[in-house]
Swiss-Prot record, chains A, B:
GO CC list: cytoplasm
Chief place where the protein resides: cytoplasm
Subcellular compartments: Cytoplasm
Gene that this sequence comes from: hisS
PROSITE patterns according to UniProt: AA_TRNA_LIGASE_II (PS50862)
Subunit description: Homodimer.
PANTHER family found in the cross-reference section: HISTIDINE--TRNA LIGASE (PTHR11476:SF7), HISTIDYL-TRNA SYNTHETASE (PTHR11476)
Annotated protein name in UniProt: Histidine--tRNA ligase
Organism: Roseobacter denitrificans (strain ATCC 33942 / OCh 114) (Erythrobacter sp. (strain OCh 114))
NCBIfam families to which the protein is assigned, alphabetical: hisS (TIGR00442)
Amino acid sequence: MAKPKKTPRPKAQTPKGFRDYFGAEVSQRAEMLQRIAGVYHRYGFDALESSGVETVEALGKFLPDVDRPNEGVFAWQEDADADKPGDWLALRYDLTAPLARVYAQHQNDLPKPYRRYAMGPVWRNEKPGPGRFRQFYQCDADTVGASSVAADAEICAMLCDCLEAVGIERGDYVVRINNRKVLNGVLEVIGALGDEPRLSQHFQEMAENLGKKMTAAKVGIVLRTIDKLDRLGKEGVRSLLGPGRKDESGDLTFGADLSKAQIDVVMSFLEAKGGTNSETLINLREIVGRSRIGKEGVDELEKISELLSAGSYGPDRIVIDPSVVRGLGYYTGPVYEAELTFEIQDDKGRTRNFGSVAGGGRYDDLVKRFTGQEVPATGVSIGVDRLLAALHAKGRLDTTDVGPVVVTVMDRDRMADYQAMVAELRQAGIRAEVYLGNPKNFGNQLKYADTRNSPVAVIEGGDEHEKGVVQIKDLILGAEIAKSATLEEWKDRPSQFEVPRAELVAKVREILAQHGLEK
Amino acid sequence: MAKPKKTPRPKAQTPKGFRDYFGAEVSQRAEMLQRIAGVYHRYGFDALESSGVETVEALGKFLPDVDRPNEGVFAWQEDADADKPGDWLALRYDLTAPLARVYAQHQNDLPKPYRRYAMGPVWRNEKPGPGRFRQFYQCDADTVGASSVAADAEICAMLCDCLEAVGIERGDYVVRINNRKVLNGVLEVIGALGDEPRLSQHFQEMAENLGKKMTAAKVGIVLRTIDKLDRLGKEGVRSLLGPGRKDESGDLTFGADLSKAQIDVVMSFLEAKGGTNSETLINLREIVGRSRIGKEGVDELEKISELLSAGSYGPDRIVIDPSVVRGLGYYTGPVYEAELTFEIQDDKGRTRNFGSVAGGGRYDDLVKRFTGQEVPATGVSIGVDRLLAALHAKGRLDTTDVGPVVVTVMDRDRMADYQAMVAELRQAGIRAEVYLGNPKNFGNQLKYADTRNSPVAVIEGGDEHEKGVVQIKDLILGAEIAKSATLEEWKDRPSQFEVPRAELVAKVREILAQHGLEK
């Protein structure tokens, strides 16, 4: 008989683009989500948790982001039933597509308007990169079925409260708002400027290839171009709005082929931000006031800032800013973005603004795919991992978890005594554990306490047991003394205390309090 | 040109076996997980969050549960790279398999022993049934690398603390412990009883088909049989340990073919529970004392109960119970199970014990698949959804979320005033919202407040605005009055109050406090 082949051992590795989170990384995120949920709830939003798996049919197979139509999902086919092939299922790629499905499925049971929040992992089947993972958290709040801009204003206020709830101080952030309708006004105005649009041969072909009307294709280029303001700068944007642009490699990107007058209008929109919100509104009215939709957009921005001011969310926090272009292609009305204004050092030691941590806006096609009915919606997504990184960069998050008090095992036969000690400490609310490894080598036990970042070790050998005392070692102080052994003032401070067994909890609590570690 | 076919609208439905969770269902589970995490943390366990996706290779393709080898996972193949086929990925089916992968992958960076907790969704590709979903939560704590039964004892204590932390009172639960080693002792003892095991023809064939030694096959039947004690009762188990058993349909199940003396030993083990833990230990020693492994198992049980007593986890909460058989086939040492002892009414109105809500035990092959090295581990899994159901059955959970205070919109042009009111309420920590639907029909606004389960509605029309007052409607009291309109005492109690605008927050807070709804 042939010897059966030995199966090779499996590799102990996460799939590419996935990672594990340990200790404080997990609990800090959990706490942040809980605080944000608290704010969302206070604003009247109800929790919704849908599952990670949806039918591909309900989800739509690809992300809506026009620039990356190939960004995919993780999908698989269910086993076939007796008479029909299995459904295709997929992991959700965001929390908005499931919201659309939920709203269409349960709409008779949901309040109208429906304010809901959702937080949880989403999955993207894309090439992983540095700091770019294929599973990450989203933390969204959306109002479905409210066409009033009061809904948008409310979400901007909520965004401010969320940032403050997680530890971003007032003055360290700003919520910038813009409106797709103003941009539509800009497009109307430039349309009126060029009765007979100048179209290059290339542009005509492209529009035909896309099966779009020429104006639609042109609008697409304008939208994509202004979305690149950050990356290309003003001159780059001007070139792309005009005949086109050569990049560093010499490759030519064809432009929207607008006239100079048209380009001037677009640029004046992007640069319309004044010293105050009122000034910005005046500038915008000047640019798009002739367009009905444009004027409506400016009116909405004015209304939003007025509603927010009434709730004391003033211009120190809410800024109308036409240069907020991200998402203008996707959204249909107001858009908003929270930006942290403080500077941080990036990985390469360069100082830069931290930038955007949340964004959202109004979109009106939420459930249309399912029901044919247009339902207005507006919502925000907070980038929890970005926010954690920001707090970390500001030194407001201690990423090392405080370890447990470690009760060492001097005498294996008296494990019950040591268990009694940890039980007392835990019942007093103190994080504590008995050493559960092989107790033979005492040095290993202290090394373990060090690995665990323990503040205190408890020692009770035979002598102590007989005398009815325990030794309590202040490991934080001990480490400080070890670091600065030359300093006389440290040398004289004892870091180990002998106390009666009955005073164990009190003494440990005292030491924790000295280090600011009490609960 | 042929008219393009209209794409049919997608169905707005969860995939079969998945469901959505709304409002209080979500927040109550989140709160429960947070409380359990608090206890786990206090016991020195560190959080671990791995992703939902693992390689099939790392995960192992199927569940370890011997009785259901076809219980599957959701799996798919990654897109191929240029030169090699894509990896197979899958959704995790529990939190233990990922722990094994994490421990093998990161072992040099982890403390030893490693106490970790994990909570999150897992997925099973099985036929859904009533109340049986293909995504559900697990909430685990495991200690890896500690061979001492002190680790098992600690987890039993922690289980008690978790139950009390989520609202199960002392006296309403018991943690029952048993030990696989005692069962191994039983098997040794019965092996010694039958020098020449009596084997039916069928039994011999089966053992050969399974490619196992006859004794191994026999042990398998004994294990599976005692695991069916709950379902078959003592007589059923006796039959299956002996020649076999005819079920109601007349089908014969072949048995383990043990002699009467052997069966008596197994049954005496299952019925060894005495009035106290000490009595049980004496009974067990009598049955398996002659077997080395059996004696070791009884010693361990004694040690565990001694360690727990030292931490004041006494016999009112910790019960040695040989009839705990679930998992004895899978685990290698101590096993434990938390059972709620109170009675509830089931769906059909029958009274029954609520039963098990958590279980676990010791298993030693955690990372062996990856490293070849045997690492001892012990851990528990708390059934969060079962626990929520238990609290609900006891009336300790209110599943209706308290709705927000609703500020109604009497005058669409004064939205800023209404926004100012909700801002004040929210800043005072009160859940509140302004009505964001079409305000034309005031009745709809009150209906909305009703749908939202709102405790209070705020009304400010033109008259009130001029007078500088607001109307505050106590909706809870209003509903009570409406229900019992014949009672004179109710009739005279007003449920609507006019207060100065400046007293809005104070009055709302007062009403909430009257209904026990203050924060």
